[in-house]
Amino acid sequence: MQNSQLFTESLPKHIAIIMDGNGRWAKSKGQPRVFGHKKGVSAVRKTIAAASKLNIQAITLFAFSSENWRRPEEEVGLLMELFITVLSSEVKKLHKNNLRLRIIGDTSRFSERLQKKIVEAQELTASNTGMVINVAANYGGKWDITQAVQKVAQQVALGDLSAEDITEDDIAKHLTMSDLPEVDLLIRTSGECRISNFMLWQMAYAEMYFTPVFWPDFGEESLIEAITWFVNRERRFGCTGEQIKALMSAQ
């Protein structure tokens, strides 16, 4: 096996990111929290572009947790409007680059206008064959497992499955990202070291990388640092950030 092939196979297939620190970043600049959220959109663009260059199979971004509804009403409203704006402005670019966009979570609580934008964005990119971008919105890991178990329970109630025969696979195939590899690498920004009810099942064996960088300051260099750490730690395959940059340039 060529070293380059071994190196490529050592990269994570599925990266999950908890995009944290927008509010604190904005506060450090003397700006309102929404300023940080808007700046965070730029970080999303940079991160998606870098991951796509590396042929990462899937990236899942934790945009809005089911607990975020507890935030001030004004901030939640601004986040929903920002979500609509970003979907409207970015989805055509994603489609042009053969990227597939999926919104993961209970979208029923969103406004009809936002739900319509979500459906349109997913339908436009559904046939694309490049990297899958999952945006977790109104998502919680406990919710994901619960809705999967409910579907299994329905099978039992219908007599299609006995309770004694339920396996992990029976539950896993009903999770929201059942068609993707489990998460190899979790990245959380802003220095917080917890997973905040994010992809509890899918991250069972993930390596977890915590960086003090606030999300608005995260970009290609930050992603390279995280992936370099992952490759050296998880695969025991010595590499440098320069090697990863070279791989990106070769794509």
Swiss-Prot record:
EC number per UniProt: 2.5.1.31
Superkingdom, natural source: Bacteria
Binding site for Mg(2+): 20, 207
InterPro entries: UPP_synth-like (IPR001441), UPP_synth-like_CS (IPR018520), UPP_synth-like_sf (IPR036424)
Keyword Acyltransferase annotated: no
Keyword terms of this UniProt record: Cell shape, Cell wall biogenesis/degradation, Magnesium, Metal-binding, Peptidoglycan synthesis, Transferase
Catalytic residues, chain numbering: 20, 68 (proton acceptor)
Cofactor stoichiometry and binding remark: Binds 2 magnesium ions per subunit.
CDD domains, A to Z: Cis_IPPS (cd00475)
Enzyme superclass (EC): transferase
GO biological process: cell wall organization; peptidoglycan biosynthetic process; polyprenol biosynthetic process; regulation of cell shape
Cofactor(s) needed: Mg(2+)
Residues involved in substrate binding: 21-25, 33, 37, 65-67, 69, 71, 188, 194-196
GO cellular component, one term: cytosol
MF-aspect GO terms: ditrans,polycis-undecaprenyl-diphosphate synthase [(2E,6E)-farnesyl-diphosphate specific] activity; magnesium ion binding
HAMAP family: ISPT
Function: Catalyzes the sequential condensation of isopentenyl diphosphate (IPP) with (2E,6E)-farnesyl diphosphate (E,E-FPP) to yield (2Z,6Z,10Z,14Z,18Z,22Z,26Z,30Z,34E,38E)-undecaprenyl diphosphate (di-trans,octa-cis-UPP). UPP is the precursor of glycosyl carrier lipid in the biosynthesis of bacterial cell wall polysaccharide components such as peptidoglycan and lipopolysaccharide.
Family that this chain belongs to: Belongs to the UPP synthase family.
Subunit structure: Homodimer.
Protein known as: Ditrans,polycis-undecaprenyl-diphosphate synthase ((2E,6E)-farnesyl-diphosphate specific)
Native organism: Vibrio vulnificus (strain YJ016)
